[in-house]
């Protein structure tokens, strides 16, 4: 989904950690990365749970430097400009219980993106992405449960090499259902911060279920929780996201 352009002041850096490049396949908007995928790449690089703050849209097919700052923050940089920052985090979040797989299939038929989609090429939830290319996670409402839900069967292109889904794709899958949990009316929102924790990688070809729910709202800020469950209904990963509605052009900044 969309990304939040907000200015950030960088702490003093200590060393260059590594570089990463986001392939065009993994876009959210057409010209920038899906936020959950970006966050997952950074967390995988660091091998720990991180709260990833998106400062600018992460560019595609471009080498990005990852810097380790002296305060423990990781900073992702392009052309000396901070794209994102990440800090170590402990994710405290009680996951909503999942529907069964067939209930999730039924919910996905009510996916709002079938009527209108701001980013139809999104790697995670885009309706123009074909099987084997996009994740095609179409989270539809289940009002009786207070969640949105979607089925997901990971394809072979997501394989880590051991018949399990790579962790950055688990993180990506946990992104967009949160948007549809907090924006059922398809209002414009931008992802500001994303914290994902993966307990266990799901298998390629496994019939998984995703749920998303609203945690709370305050003005333009909306928090969402998401979770992914394996074919046995066991929790495998979860995420907490902060989504922000952009100010209208005439709105005061006070």
Predicted ranges, named:
Residues 1-4:
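Ser/Thr/Pro/Gly-rich low-complexity, intrinsically disordered segments
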Residues 7-19, 71-162:
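Non-catalytic linker/capping segments at the edges of enzyme domains
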Residues 15-19, 49, 145-149, 193, ...:
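Intrinsic-disorder/low-complexity, polar/charged segments enriched in Ser/Thr/Lys/Arg/Asp/Glu/Gln
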Residues 26, 30-33, 38-65, 69-70, ...:
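Hydrophobic beta-strand-centered segment that forms part of the acyl-chain substrate-binding groove
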Residues 51, 73-77, 223-227:
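Residue-level detector of beta-strand face positions
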Residues 70-74, 217-220:
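Short, conserved beta-turn/loop elements at beta-strand boundaries and strand-helix junctions
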Residues 135-199:
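A mid-sequence, solvent-exposed acidic-amphipathic segment
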């Amino acid at each position: 989904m969309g990304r939040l352009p907000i200015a950030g002041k960088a702490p003093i850096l200590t060393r260059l950690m590594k570089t990463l490049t986001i392939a065009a396949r993994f876009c959210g908007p057409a010209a920038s990365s899906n936020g959950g995928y970006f966050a997952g790449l950074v967390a995988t690089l660091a091998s720990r749970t991180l709260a990833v703050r998106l400062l600018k849209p992460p560019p595609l097919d471009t080498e990005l430097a990852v810097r380790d700052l002296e305060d423990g923050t990781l900073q992702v940089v392009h052309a000396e400009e901070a794209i994102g920052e990440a800090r170590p985090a402990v994710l405290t979040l009680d996951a909503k219980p999942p529907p069964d797989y067939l209930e999730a299939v039924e919910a996905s038929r009510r996916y709002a993106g079938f009527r209108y989609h701001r980013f139809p090429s999104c790697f995670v939830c885009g309706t123009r992405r074909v099987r084997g290319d996009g994740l095609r996670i179409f989270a539809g409402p289940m009002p009786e449960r207070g969640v949105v839900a979607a089925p997901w069967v990971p394809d072979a292109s997501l394989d880590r090499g051991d018949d399990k889904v790579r962790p950055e794709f688990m993180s990506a899958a946990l992104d967009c259902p949160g948007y549809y949990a907090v924006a059922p009316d398809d209002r414009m929102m931008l992802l500001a911060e994303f914290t994902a924790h993966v307990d266990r990688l799901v298998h390629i070809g496994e019939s998984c279920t995703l749920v998303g729910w609203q945690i709370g709202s305050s003005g333009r800020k909306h928090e969402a929780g998401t979770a992914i469950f394996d074919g046995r209904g066991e929790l495998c990963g979860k995420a907490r996201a902060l989504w922000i509605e952009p100010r209208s052009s005439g709105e005061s900044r006070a």
